Amino acid sequence: MEQMKPCAANSPPLTPIGFLERAATVYGDCTSIVYGSNTVYTWRETNLRCLRVASSLSSIGIGRSDVVSVLSPNTPAMYELQFAVPMSGAILNNINTRLDARTVSVLLRHCGSKLLFVDVFSVDLAVEAISMMTTDPPILVFIADKEEEGGDADVADRTKFSYTYDDLIHRGDLDFKWIRPESEWDPVVLNYTSGTTSAPKGVVHCHRGIFVMSIDSLIDWTVPKNPVYLWTLPIFHANGWSYPWGIAAVGGTNVCLRKFDAPLIYRLIRDHGVTHMCGAPVVLNMLSATNEFQPLNRPVNILTAGAPPPAAVLLRAESIGFVISHGYGLTETAGLNVSCAWKPQWNRLPASDRARLKARQGVRTVGFTEIDVVDPESGRSVERNGETVGEIVMRGSSIMLGYLKDPVGTEKALKNGWFYTGDVGVIHSDGYLEIKDRSKDIIITGGENVSSVEVETVLYTNPAVNEVAVVARPDVFWGETPCAFVSLKSGLTQRPTEVEMIEYCRKKMPKYMVPKTVSFVDELPKTSTGKVMKFVLREIAKKMGTTRLSRM
């Protein structure tokens, strides 16, 4: 048996792109995409549209190793491009539409993007970002949206756009043979973990990793054939946790949603028979807080991740008819590879106990290899008592290849056979993981990751600021919001107010990163070595209570 080895027949490259081809064969007449009032496609039509776009990309010189970026919300075009771009051999790069122009330009330069698809309502953002690029700007492709008022207008400045999305579909070759990867380790997607302007972290994933994560996500969430999936999770967030490819694998219906609107979501659930949806805990807040909801006539499965939803929110959402699952993952893992696997006997527990158990992140998914919590000094596993903290490490097929153009960062994250997440947690006696803190000081607000260091960097540019530290403050709606503690310089003739400091930040960063609270202090608490004691500030922010009870 030792002589038996892999050969071309038993080791062709794994790729999630083949899910679309199979869906067109098996589920050809089934609905693939629903959007607005008039947009409906079948899986056969979606496959042909993607082939046409891939063909057109190839004809204009896009091919292997080229990066193609997309700046769009959850529209049909956004979904199709998750397949069409890799079918051309290129690497897909979804960009957060909530970023500012400066950050978008930095990301485009960093990855060397050759082409940028731009949604009609992101044109100004894209054009401003491109204007900041002095060399090699990407080709621009305009995406119209006939379902939205003003969405089918002509390109504002046609000279800056080389093509429209419809152009690429109409000129594409139906007989085009999509370009399969030469190796399953070839890059297929590139995601940025946050909008930093100093050191962007571009996470590169391969075909094999996305294939495994897509299948694993379906198995772990027990997604059946022909689900109806509502896109409340932005696809630009870690590629929608790999569900664009997963839903194709099971022939589901993708109900596309441009922006979150609770009353509209309830209508879509009712009209289309939605069975599954994903999102940050803020999604649960919004759905359970609106006055326009009605109890669901059938269960709807919601998968959430990040900061655990408060018990009160869980109970309200469940009373409406949502079945909530909680998990954990990172951009570097391509989706959720830890889930709070529910045990039937837990259903008999009081509601408060169920909420406590559901708030834990859980155990590895069935397709993942291993997770652990280790002592950062010794590298040994910590005691499984729910109290001893350590760094969360993991390994499995969906772990990233590395960070683009960052060998030092890659080596730091991938070492000793493990991916070091930078997150701090505990393992309970039953083997379930629970996150306790973010060692990298990441604030999770409404599902967006905010680096406290980035916010501090901006605040330090204010001439009145002496010292600043940013931590998370609890928020009943967003989960967390940035809270800045600021020490002002002495001798100021005019001291800035909290409102003025917030407005200063608003002009220099995306809206979701702007501190919602600015607290002025004489001096920041420090250790004997001069290091700011953020844990003290977190406790102060926690005692402040939630930021507010309103959405804005």
Curated annotation (Swiss-Prot):
Record GO terms (molecular function): ligase activity
EC top class named in words: ligase
Protein name: Probable acyl-activating enzyme 5, peroxisomal
Main location: other
One GO cellular component, as annotated: peroxisome
Organism: Arabidopsis thaliana
Function: May act as an acid--thiol ligase that activates carboxylic acids by forming acyl-CoAs.
Keyword terms: Fatty acid metabolism, Ligase, Lipid metabolism, Peroxisome
Pfam families: AMP-binding, AMP-binding_C
UniProt-listed InterPro entries: AMP-bd_C, AMP-bd_C_sf, AMP-binding_CS, AMP-dep_synth/lig_dom, ANL_N_sf
Localisation per UniProt entry: Peroxisome
CDD domains reported in the protein's UniProt record: ttLC_FACS_AEE21_like
Lineage: Eukaryota, Viridiplantae, Streptophyta, Embryophyta, Tracheophyta
Tissue-by-tissue expression: Expressed in roots, stems and developing seeds.
GO biological-process terms attached to the record: fatty acid metabolic process
The protein's Enzyme Commission number: 6.2.1.-
Family, similarity comment: Belongs to the ATP-dependent AMP-binding enzyme family.
Motif (Microbody targeting signal): 550-552
